[in-house]
């Protein structure tokens, strides 16, 4: 019974901490997503132009046509 009470109090405490800290970070998820996309795109450059050969791991600027093995 004591263990159950301690677990319930701990869960409620952690939930309260999550709720109080989430108000201060409102609207930053979009910024984080944009930053992560920018970082990924910077890591992948330089990309291959259209007509270049591509494989299973696409390094094309656009998409990879797997059937023709060429960047589109």
Curated annotation (Swiss-Prot):
Instruction: For this UniProt record, give its keywords in alphabetical order, as a comma-separated list.
Output: Disulfide bond, Knottin, Secreted, Signal, Toxin
Q: Classify the source by domain of life.
A: Eukaryota
Would the keyword Phosphoprotein be found if you checked this record's keyword annotation?
A: no
Q: What Pfam families does this protein's entry cite?
A: Conotoxin (PF02950)
The GO molecular function terms of this record are: ion channel inhibitor activity; toxin activity
A GO CC term assigned to this protein in UniProt? extracellular region
Instruction: List all disulphide bridges recorded for this chain.
Output: 47-61, 54-64, 60-71
| Tissue expression notes | Expressed by the venom duct.
State where the protein is found.
Secreted
List the signal peptide residues. Answer: 1-22
Q: Which residues form the propeptide?
A: 23-46
Which family is annotated? Belongs to the conotoxin O1 superfamily.
What does the entry note on its domains? The presence of a 'disulfide through disulfide knot' structurally defines this protein as a knottin. The cysteine framework is VI/VII (C-C-CC-C-C).
What's the protein here called? Answer: Conotoxin Lt6.3
Which organism is the protein's source?
Conus litteratus (Lettered cone)
């Amino acid at each position: 019974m004591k263990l159950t009470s301690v677990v319930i109090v701990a869960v409620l405490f952690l939930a309260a901490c999550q709720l109080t800290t989430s108000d201060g970070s409102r609207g930053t998820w979009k910024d984080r997503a944009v930053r992560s996309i920018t970082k990924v795109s910077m890591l992948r450059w330089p990309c291959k132009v259209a007509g270049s050969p591509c494989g299973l791991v696409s390094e094309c600027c656009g998409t990879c046509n797997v059937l023709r093995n060429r960047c589109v």
